[in-house]
């Protein structure tokens, strides 16, 4: 993560306003020993994100960077033995100076098994916020106009009106997007 912070630090000498850097941290497909395995991995993730934020602060870049986590699947709430099965909903972390932090965005589901939010199959919750909405807001931070979002995110209009004067979710600080 320190190497990423250093790469961000030289962006101006490369003539870049903003960059996209992708890191992969695999091994989250826990079908067994979910609690023990995930606790250790969350500790590693926490240490990495904390170290990254401290490096950004040391470089004076904390207000210029957004860190976003994403996954291609969630987990069911009901155990299938020693773990859980694949599901649709999940969660994302968004952090950085341009972010209105300390909030939960989206609608938290009723996590009671067989509730109206449970679509069956052992606690699969219907997502309430599309990843397209997260990406749409990040694209606005990169300077993509609202009208052009549907070129990059063909499904965005299923969740957000590109003619809106507001952001898809609202996690960006006012004045940090165009």
Model-derived segments and spans:
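Feature marks hydrolase-like catalytic cores characterized by long aromatic- and Gly/Pro-rich stretches
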Residues: 17, 27-178
């Amino acid at each position: 993560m320190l190497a990423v912070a250093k790469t961000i630090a030289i962006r101006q000498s490369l003539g870049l306003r903003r960059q996209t850097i992708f890191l992969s941290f695999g091994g989250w497909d826990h079908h067994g020993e979910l609690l023990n395995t995930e606790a250790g991995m969350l500790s590693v993730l926490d240490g990495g994100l904390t170290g990254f934020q401290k490096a950004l602060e040391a470089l004076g870049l904390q207000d210029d960077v957004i860190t976003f986590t994403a996954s291609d699947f969630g987990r069911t709430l009901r155990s299938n033995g020693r773990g859980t099965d694949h599901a649709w909903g999940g969660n994302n972390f968004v952090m950085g100076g341009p972010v209105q932090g300390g909030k939960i965005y989206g609608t938290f589901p009723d996590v009671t098994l067989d509730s109206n939010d449970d679509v069956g199959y052992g606690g699969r919750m219907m997502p309430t916020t599309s990843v397209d909405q997260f990406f749409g807001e990040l694209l606005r931070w990169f300077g993509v106009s609202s009208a052009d979002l549907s070129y990059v995110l063909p499904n965005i209009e299923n969740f957000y009106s590109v003619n809106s004067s507001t952001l898809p979710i609202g996690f960006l600080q006012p004045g940090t997007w165009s």
